[in-house]
């Protein structure tokens, strides 16, 4: 497993190791992080759509950002919902034949641990909050769903956060 350091919230730095080209993407936590990102329309939606996925679905609780993103990126599907239910996440994954997930949902990422069948999923990137507490559980979950953790990045500006990347074992 490769280890690295994330130095920015900018999507092209923060999520650069998740390649979604040709995939079916579920972006959990797709709203803008800063007002500057919002003004520049430079969030994860723009970043992932620039990679030319077959399908893109963004979910976030910020209705204003969901409205803006829906207008800016009509090729995407956007939902204003709180991603805090394993059942709901599993439904989105199944109904949309999701192959790639980016997850940054401020602690609710732990709901993923309850999903046992990831269907068509090939790759996932998860921002862990309180990463020391949850890292071992996510590594075990990866193993249980047939994934390997290929990268673990610490975040230089917040020691309680890290990003793990997993993919289907060959």
Residue ranges and their predicted role:
Residues 83-90, 110:
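Short loop/turn elements that flank and shape the SAM/SAH-binding pocket of Class I
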Residues 2-86:
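SAM cofactor-binding core of SAM-dependent methyltransferases
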Residues 16-19, 91-95:
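A short acidic-Thr-Gly-centered motif at the start of a beta-strand
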Residues 48, 55-57, 76, 92-170:
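Conserved acidic-Pro-Pro-aromatic motif
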């Amino acid at each position: 497993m490769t280890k690295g350091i994330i130095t920015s919230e900018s999507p092209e730095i923060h999520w650069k190791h998740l390649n979604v080209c040709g995939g079916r993407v579920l972006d959990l936590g797709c709203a803008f992080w800063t007002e500057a990102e919002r003004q520049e329309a430079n969030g994860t939606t723009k970043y992932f759509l620039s990679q030319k996925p077959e399908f893109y679905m963004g979910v976030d609780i910020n209705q204003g950002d969901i409205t803006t993103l829906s207008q800016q990126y009509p090729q995407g599907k956007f939902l204003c919902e709180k991603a805090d239910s394993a059942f709901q996440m599993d439904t989105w994954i199944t109904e949309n034949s999701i192959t790639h997930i980016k997850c940054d949902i401020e602690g609710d990422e732990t709901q993923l641990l309850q999903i046992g069948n990831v269907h068509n999923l090939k790759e996932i990137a998860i921002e862990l909050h309180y990463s020391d507490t949850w890292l071992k559980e996510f590594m075990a979950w990866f193993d249980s769903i047939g994934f390997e953790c290929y990268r673990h990045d610490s975040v230089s500006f917040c020691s309680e956060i890290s990003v793990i990347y997993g993919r289907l074992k060959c």
